[in-house]
Amino acid sequence: MSDPSSINGGIVVAMTGKDCVAIACDLRLGSQSLGVSNKFEKIFHYGHVFLGITGLATDVTTLNEMFRYKTNLYKLKEERAIEPETFTQLVSSSLYERRFGPYFVGPVVAGINSKSGKPFIAGFDLIGCIDEAKDFIVSGTASDQLFGMCESLYEPNLEPEDLFETISQALLNAADRDALSGWGAVVYIIKKDEVVKRYLKMRQD
């Protein structure tokens, strides 16, 4: 039996810049080596917080719906949008609740704190252990390749356009070296007052 989190393939990467943060994913949905769709986005947003989820596609969809419900409930109770740091704790506790029958996912959180304006990124394992970073977080079937590309290309305090170029090159080159991811990509550049979404074309083989 293969690892359930690699059956459908897919990758997510997040990077911090100067007063900005970027998160990107590929668009492939597969069933091992069989391609199913090239329009499967793995990044979701709840207010100004972004969540990328790799892993088993059914769990990705389930978690998106669950976090949509929980963040809407939070907004009703607290009368404010959830901050990235708070959302990270919510993701962690939600995954840990299911530790004996876990969701087979690798979530990545990215966002800008609305008060301090500081960029924030964090990753998790499938039972909710938090991995905060100041530079980049990777997840998915090409995570080894992404680590190599990010360590080669990343520089601290990049401007938004330079950050877009860096995260795009890292994702495109990593996906080219992994049979289970690719088929296009989507990149979000998040600043305090705006979000830019761009699609990248990739090889379709």
UniProtKB/Swiss-Prot annotation:
Gene Ontology MF, one: endopeptidase activator activity
Subcellular location: Cytoplasm; Nucleus
UniProt entry keywords in alphabetical sequence: Cytoplasm, Isopeptide bond, Nucleus, Phosphoprotein, Proteasome, Ubl conjugation
Transmembrane feature ranges: none
Cross-link (Glycyl lysine isopeptide (Lys-Gly) (interchain with G-Cter in ubiquitin)): K70
GO biological process terms on file: proteasomal ubiquitin-independent protein catabolic process; proteasome-mediated ubiquitin-dependent protein catabolic process
Alphabetized CDD domains for the sequence: proteasome_beta_type_3
Residues recorded as bearing Phosphoserine in the entry: S31
UniProt subunit comment: The 26S proteasome consists of a 20S proteasome core and two 19S regulatory subunits. The 20S proteasome core is composed of 28 subunits that are arranged in four stacked rings, resulting in a barrel-shaped structure. The two end rings are each formed by seven alpha subunits, and the two central rings are each formed by seven beta subunits. The catalytic chamber with the active sites is on the inside of the barrel.
Family, per entry: Belongs to the peptidase T1B family.
Function: Non-catalytic component of the proteasome which degrades poly-ubiquitinated proteins in the cytoplasm and in the nucleus. It is essential for the regulated turnover of proteins and for the removal of misfolded proteins. The proteasome is a multicatalytic proteinase complex that is characterized by its ability to cleave peptides with Arg, Phe, Tyr, Leu, and Glu adjacent to the leaving group at neutral or slightly basic pH. It has an ATP-dependent proteolytic activity. This subunit may participate in the trypsin-like activity of the enzyme complex.
The protein's name: Proteasome subunit beta type-3
Species this chain originates from: Saccharomyces cerevisiae (strain ATCC 204508 / S288c) (Baker's yeast)
Lineage of the species this protein comes from: Eukaryota, Fungi, Dikarya, Ascomycota, Saccharomycotina
